[in-house]
Amino acid sequence: MDFLLRYATTQTSVGVQTNRIVVNTTRIAHAYGYEPTIMTFQRNMTMTLSPVLGDGRHSYRPLDAHPASGMLQHRHGPLNFFFNAELSRLSWYTYDNHPSLDELEERFQKILNTPPMNRWLVLYLISQANMAFCLLFGGDLVSGLFVFLGTFCGFLLRQELNRRHVYHYLTVVLSAFVASFVVGLGAKFGYEEFPKIALSASVLYLIPGVPFINGMMDILDGYVLNGISRLLTAVMIVVSITVGLSVTLMSLGLSLL
């Protein structure tokens, strides 16, 4: 029970949609002869485990079975597609090989202890990607360079604020403001040929694409409350981005219209 709750809530923290969390967790439970009933919410997860006999579609619950229930709060962490893939792979390994609980825990901890990608490399790649978006949308090279610099400063601030556990939406507001303000300075002093494109591209790295996608997938999979919750979270992030960008526009007397 303890392992399954930690396994499931870890998946939530790294950006896995609800249906995949339920399927992966159920797969592991079946490998050890249990049938889970899982309820997921925005902040916690509840699970009930019932022992079953048999295998596959012919399993049944004994009359003297005593289900056990537990609840655990979701963990908080950044999106991590490596964890997403490895945790899913762990569920298949468990289903096919039936390892001991000690081995399963060891493999789980090995995944969690995987060192993250170098933060400076991530910072450079995201800045480069945002610059590429600016050029792709028709911006000039100078505008792209300002977007690179603005994204670098904004994302660096976001990394530092996240390390200090600053309120999430405030972090987004400040990051959007810093990134757009750096780009706005280039527009204010006439260095950029396409300032509107540059300003629009400067905050693209903050767009919550995964929450939007997961929210829609949850709704389509029937997890309507979870989907709405994720979509509302994504909308709040977009509102925070808008606030940060609006402060820049008002401060520098610029407009996107």
Named regions from a protein language model:
Residues 1-99:
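Soluble N-terminal domains of membrane-associated systems
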Residues 2, 15, 19, 77-84, ...:
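Electropositive phosphate-/nucleotide-binding environments in soluble metabolic enzymes
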Residues 76-143, 233-242, 253:
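Alpha-helical transmembrane segments and their cytosolic membrane-interface
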Residues 107-111, 154-165, 211-226:
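C-terminal ends of transmembrane helices
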Residues 115-189, 193:
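Core alpha-helical transmembrane segments of integral membrane proteins
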Residues 187-257:
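Generic detector of multi-pass transmembrane helix bundles and their immediately adjacent loops
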